[in-house]
From Swiss-Prot:
This protein's record includes keyword Cell inner membrane: yes
Protein name, entry field: Fluoride-specific ion channel FluC
UniProt catalytic activity: fluoride(in) = fluoride(out)
Family statement drawn from the similarity comment of this UniProt entry: Belongs to the fluoride channel Fluc/FEX (TC 1.A.43) family.
Natural source organism: Chlorobium chlorochromatii (strain CaD3)
Activity-regulation annotation: Na(+) is not transported, but it plays an essential structural role and its presence is essential for fluoride channel function.
GO molecular function: fluoride channel activity; metal ion binding
Function, in words: Fluoride-specific ion channel. Important for reducing fluoride concentration in the cell, thus reducing its toxicity.
UniProt binding sites for Na(+): 78, 81
GO biological process, one term: cellular detoxification of fluoride
GO cellular component, one term: plasma membrane
Classification via InterPro entries: FluC
Length: 129
C-alpha cells in the first residue's frame, strides 16, 4: 500500500510540474500562436519524444528506476502533453474554415508524434550504448 501511495504522489507532483511547464511554453509561444496552435503541437511532440526516450531508458538500462519512470512518464509527460487542447484547437481551425491549417495540425501531430517517439527511443538506445 505504501508503494501505491508513493506512486500516486509521484504522479500528482509530476503532473503538476508538467502542467506548469506546458503553461509556460504556451506563454512563451503566445506571440506566434495567433493563427496556428504551435504551443500545443510543440508540447505534444516534445512529450512524445520524452515518453519514448524515458521509457526506452527504463526498459533497457538501470538509469531510470520504476518510480522515476512513473514520475516522469505518467506524471510529468501526462501533465505536459494535452490531447484535449489538441482536439479543441483542431475543431476551432475547422470551424474557422482554416482547412489547410487543420490538415497540417492533424498530420503534424500524428505523424510528428510517432516520429518524435521513435527518435526518443533511438536516442535512448544510443545513449545506453
Amino acid at each position: 500500500m505504501v508503494d501505491k501511495a508513493a506512486h500516486i504522489l509521484l504522479v500528482g507532483v509530476g503532473g503538476f510540474l508538467g502542467s506548469v511547464a506546458r503553461y509556460l511554453v504556451a506563454l512563451w509561444m503566445a506571440p506566434i500562436t495567433a493563427v496556428f496552435p504551435f504551443a500545443t503541437l510543440t508540447v505534444n511532440l516534445l512529450g512524445s519524444f520524452l515518453i519514448g526516450f524515458i521509457s526506452e531508458l527504463a526498459l533497457s538500462t538501470s538509469l531510470i528506476s520504476p518510480s522515476t519512470r512513473i514520475f516522469l512518464v505518467t506524471g510529468f509527460c501526462g501533465g505536459f502533453t494535452t490531447f484535449s487542447s489538441y482536439m479543441i484547437e483542431h475543431s476551432a481551425l475547422l470551424r474557422d474554415g482554416e482547412h489547410l491549417y487543420a490538415a497540417l495540425y492533424l498530420f503534424g501531430s500524428l505523424i510528428g508524434g510517432f516520429i518524435a517517439l521513435y527518435l526518443g527511443i533511438i536516442s535512448a538506445r544510443w545513449m545506453a550504448g
